[in-house]
């Protein structure tokens, strides 16, 4: 393979956002080795690199699709939205880590390195176009997530969560790799996604039993990363045991990266096997919506409740993936953008509450409104938006997602989604009711000893700043849903692999 300076620059420009983050990792390591008063600069470099990376990605959205590194990486508007979403989620999660590290006195450098490495892995995964790059970047994201989940080494629950996540994650990765090896063999030794599709057509393997076996392995591997039923067993334990700020991070980033991977593989490699993977994914999505919401009702831990809530939420996302057209993908991405604000806003609120009280029990939130009306209001708005209460952003996002699913003929999935959304409102409203409980009615000692917060509007606390941004997004972004949809649809129309 012949390389020249011009092609090197062209290829490098396509991954410039990731290169910026890699450079920030090197700078962070150097600062950690050379500077004593390093805390400010570590956070400054991390946040600045993410902002610059997002800015570069915004400019790349307008460009024509580009295949770089001999076709191994694809840059287009579709995966650009996913890359921006991952970088933006990390940008909102760093303030959560700042507050958590300050209160728990944990090492800052390692936390930021793992977080940025996971971000880089997720962003590369969104544009990966061959099996080797997909697997390497997926493992980069996964390994960093394992390390983050067990970061509080003195916490037994955190160690248990990391071990379960590692073992289950390793098993799912090996299943996915096995599916990839079948694809490689059946396609005649091809590794790039479009070439695999062409190879399967040429070898007339699409009607064989082997393709069904490949689909089962690949769906199982991706379903684990997305916490879809029945591959969700690790999720509640990891959510409960890992640091809350860490859970906030990979509850969003891993799902965004997983959705990007699912859409790219199913819409490219298995485009001629629509009936097979549509049926399997629809069954998994329906099970996720039902089990996630019904089991969430019984939970007493806030983090476990959010774990099952996230399982049901990813079931809703799958409606857009199963639709398999530009409208379905546009609705999925629109809801994903709203979900970032809703989910991170909720996790930011419970992170702050946990740092001030040291409890995760749902009952201990009783009477919070009397002690901290702003935090209580922000948490209530985020939860209600997750439930899809109008006129919050979650309502408009779900409405558009279900409408596109209905148009695509997914009547059963949409009906189940509507029914389970009503169920989810029950357990979200139950928490809101506890929050506004009158003092001394059902309040516990945690709330009675709770220290009233300062004014959020003038607060210098980074986590409170993240809360404000997320709550504004989850509350008011639904108002501008039409412009958001128009931008997403226009961006998707420029992508080369979307089949209308």
UniProtKB/Swiss-Prot annotation:
Q: Which GO terms describe its molecular function?
A: NADH dehydrogenase (ubiquinone) activity; quinone binding
Q: What EC number(s) does its UniProt record assign?
A: 7.1.1.-
> How does this protein lie in the membrane?
Multi-pass membrane protein
Record's keyword annotation contains Metal-binding: no
Cited InterPro entries = NADH-Q_OxRdtase_suN/2, ND/Mrp_TM, Ndh2_N
Q: Name the source's superkingdom.
A: Eukaryota
The protein's matches in Pfam families, at most eight in alphabetical order, are given as: Ndh2_N, Proton_antipo_M
Q: Which residues form a coiled coil?
A: none
> Where are its TM segments located?
14-34, 41-61, 78-98, 116-136, 166-186, 211-231, 242-262, 277-297, 305-325, 335-355, 376-396, 409-429, 467-487
List the catalysed reactions. Answer: a plastoquinone + NADH + (n+1) H(+)(in) = a plastoquinol + NAD(+) + n H(+)(out); a plastoquinone + NADPH + (n+1) H(+)(in) = a plastoquinol + NADP(+) + n H(+)(out)
Localization per record: Plastid, Chloroplast thylakoid membrane
| Function as written in the Swiss-Prot or TrEMBL entry | NDH shuttles electrons from NAD(P)H:plastoquinone, via FMN and iron-sulfur (Fe-S) centers, to quinones in the photosynthetic chain and possibly in a chloroplast respiratory chain. The immediate electron acceptor for the enzyme in this species is believed to be plastoquinone. Couples the redox reaction to proton translocation, and thus conserves the redox energy in a proton gradient.
To which protein family does this belong?
Belongs to the complex I subunit 2 family.
This chain belongs to which protein, by name?
NAD(P)H-quinone oxidoreductase subunit 2 A, chloroplastic
- The species this protein belongs to is Anthoceros angustus (Hornwort)
* Organism ancestry: Eukaryota, Viridiplantae, Streptophyta, Embryophyta, Anthocerotophyta
Q: What gene is it encoded by?
A: ndhB1
């Amino acid at each position: 393979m012949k390389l020249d300076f011009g092609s090197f620059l062209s290829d490098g420009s396509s991954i410039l956002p990731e290169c910026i983050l890699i450079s920030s990792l090197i700078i962070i390591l150097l600062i950690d080795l050379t500077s004593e008063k390093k805390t400010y600069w570590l956070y400054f470099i991390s946040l600045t690199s993410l902002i610059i990376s997002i800015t570069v990605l915004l400019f790349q959205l307008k460009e024509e699709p580009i295949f770089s590194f001999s076709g191994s990486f694809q840059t287009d508007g579709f995966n650009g939205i996913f890359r921006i979403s991952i970088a933006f989620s990390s940008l909102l999660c760093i303030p959560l880590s700042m507050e958590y590290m300050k209160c728990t006195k944990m090492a800052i450098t390692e936390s930021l390195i793992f977080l940025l490495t996971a971000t880089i892995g997720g962003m590369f995964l969104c544009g990966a176009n061959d099996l080797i790059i997909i697997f390497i970047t997926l493992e980069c994201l996964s390994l960093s997530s394992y390390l983050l989940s067990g970061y509080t080494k003195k916490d037994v629950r955190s160690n248990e969560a990391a071990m379960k996540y590692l073992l289950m994650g390793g098993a799912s990765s090996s299943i996915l790799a096995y599916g990839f090896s079948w694809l490689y063999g059946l396609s005649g030794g091809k590794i790039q996604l479009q070439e695999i599709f062409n190879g399967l057509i040429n070898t007339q393997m699409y009607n064989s039993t082997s393709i069904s076996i490949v689909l089962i392995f690949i769906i199982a591997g991706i379903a684990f990363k997305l916490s879809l039923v029945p591959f969700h067993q690790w999720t509640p334990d990891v959510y409960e045991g890992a640091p809350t700020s860490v859970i906030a991070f990979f509850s969003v980033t891993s799902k965004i990266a997983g959705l990007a991977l699912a859409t790219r593989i199913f819409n490219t490699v298995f485009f001629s096997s629509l009936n097979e993977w549509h049926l399997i994914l629809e069954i998994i999505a329906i099970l996720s919506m039902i089990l996630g919401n019904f089991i969430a009702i019984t939970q007493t831990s806030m983090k476990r409740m959010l774990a099952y809530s996230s399982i049901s939420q990813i079931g809703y996302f799958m409606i857009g993936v199963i639709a398999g057209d530009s409208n379905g993908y546009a609705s999925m991405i629109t809801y994903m953008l709203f979900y970032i604000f809703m989910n991170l806003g909720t996790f930011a609120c419970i992170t702050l509450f946990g740092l001030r009280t040291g409890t995760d029990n749902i009952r201990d939130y009783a009477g919070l409104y009397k002690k901290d009306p702003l935090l209580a209001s922000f948490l209530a708005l985020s939860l209600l938006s997750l439930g899809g209460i109008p006129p919050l952003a979650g309502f408009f996002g779900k409405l558009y997602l279900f409408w596109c699913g209905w148009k695509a003929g997914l009547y059963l999935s949409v009906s189940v989604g509507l029914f389970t959304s009503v169920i989810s409102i029950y357990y979200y409203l139950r928490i809101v009711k506890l929050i506004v409980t009158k003092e001394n009615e059902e309040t516990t000692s945690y709330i009675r000893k709770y220290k009233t917060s300062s004014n959020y509007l003038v607060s210098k606390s980074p986590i409170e700043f993240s809360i404000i941004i997320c709550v504004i997004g989850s509350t008011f972004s639904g108002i501008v849903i039409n412009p958001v949809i128009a931008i997403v649809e226009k961006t998707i129309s420029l992508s080369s692999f979307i089949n209308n």
